[in-house]
Design a protein with these regions (language model features):
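Short, acidic Gly/Pro/Ser/Thr-rich loop/turn segments
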Residues: 20, 56-57, 69-72, 167-170, ...
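Residue-level signature of catalytic and energy-coupling elements of molecular machines
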Residues: 16, 67, 180, 250, ...
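N-terminal amphipathic/basic leader segments beginning at the initiator methionine
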Residues: 2-38
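Predominant activation on well-ordered alpha-helical scaffold segments within soluble catalytic domains
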Residues: 21-28, 46-50, 60, 91, ...
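A generic structural signal for residues located within well-ordered alpha-helices
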Residues: 15, 19, 85, 194, ...
Length: 341
């Protein structure tokens, strides 16, 4: 039996604590670039410390969200491009709280992997810090777990938690939505972070396409198209004058069909005109290759619309000018469902 170096039994079992400490210590300076004066304490403490400044907010409401990236990670791992999925995670979480009217305060990440690869970890932290700086939130903490008995070689998973704040009187909950209000769609740049299990089945398994392949109709090689970074809509939403947005829906894993109803009053329907915008070619490719129904496409994918804002006709022109969005439908009397036209 091979003799195990004293103190290295855990490393021989697949968990190298010393390597983890060295890698994380080397990236502390990058993480600090996301800090403002609100962040207290040092990196690596048992808990992240954040001195919230709620000046100008009479009744602050904290808003939280947690999410993952899903099987988009399979594409990142296959191509060795990892920073983008870290950005995806931050932006997805920011959008999820932006629909309530909240602005982000801080973000925490979780990385679980078969082993800690310094190159992969460096790219992930680069992506997290880039998106946090762009989103004006601090990367206040995280957890990195080496789990050789859980993940296959080279695999990892990501999750993220975000905390934001909004004035209670400014919460967006859809309660002010009425028939005749308009739906303004903000464009996505691709799949964002959902539908990748189906997309991979169709594009890679059924159609036998290669991630490095240039496919007719796509602006980039297939893999790069699939790794386009999830857009962050919070800043443009925050630029719209107070009160003009009546409700907002982040269009992710249930598509327009499942996610618009989350903000509809019980007596309202959303009538979506699907011919009012151009569906990106990647979705058409998936639909044709997989022989997928229109209904299912709009329930799995965002189909080119990453965020929907509900506004009155009075404010629509100003919101359109500010967001570069498109009117994609309207609110009608109904029972809380979405109708595709």
């Amino acid at each position: 039996m091979r003799k195990v170096e004293k103190g290295k039994a855990y490393a021989s079992a697949g968990v190298d604590i010393d390597l983890g400490n060295r890698v994380k210590k080397g990236l502390q300076a990058r993480v600090r670039t996301t800090f403002g004066p609100e962040v207290l304490g040092r990196i690596g403490g048992f808990g992240g410390l954040f001195k919230a400044d709620f000046k100008g907010i009479k009744e602050p409401v904290l808003v939280s969200s947690i999410d993952g990236v899903g099987t988009k990670l399979k594409i990142a791992i296959a191509l060795g491009k990892h920073a983008t999925v870290a950005q995806d995670l931050v932006n997805h979480c920011i959008n999820d709280i932006a629909v309530t009217g909240a602005r982000p305060l801080f973000f925490l990440d979780y990385i679980g992997a078969e082993r800690l690869d310094p190159v992969v970890f460096d790219q992930l932290i680069f992506g997290f810090t880039k998106a946090c700086k762009e989103g004006h939130c601090a990367l206040i903490g995280g957890e990195t777990a080496q789990l050789p008995d859980l993940y296959r070689s080279g695999e990892y998973d990501l999750a993220g938690c975000i905390i934001g704040v909004v004035e209670r009187t400014r919460l967006l909950d859809g309660s002010r939505i009425v028939p005749s209000d308009l739906l303004i769609g903000l464009p996505s740049n691709g799949l964002h972070t959902n539908g990748y299990t189906l997309a991979r089945k169709v594009l890679l398994d059924k159609m036998q396409l290669d991630l490095l392949q240039k496919v007719d109709g796509l602006a980039k090689p297939l893999g790069d198209e699939l790794l386009r970074v999830h857009r962050n809509y919070q800043a443009v939403m925050a630029s719209i004058p107070l009160g003009q947005i009546k409700g907002a829906a982040h269009i992710t894993g249930g598509g327009l069909i499942d996610y618009l109803p989350r903000i509809l009053p019980a007596a309202c329907d959303a009538l979506v005109n699907t011919s009012s915008w151009t569906v990106p070619p990647i979705f058409r490719l998936i639909q044709r290759g997989g022989d997928i129904s229109r209904e299912e496409m709009y329930q799995v994918f965002n189909m080119g619309i990453g965020m929907v804002l509900v506004v009155s006709k009075l404010h629509a022109s100003g919101v359109l000018l500010q967001t570069k969005g498109k009117v994609i439908g309207q609110i009608t009397a109904g029972s809380g469902k979405v109708c595709l036209g």
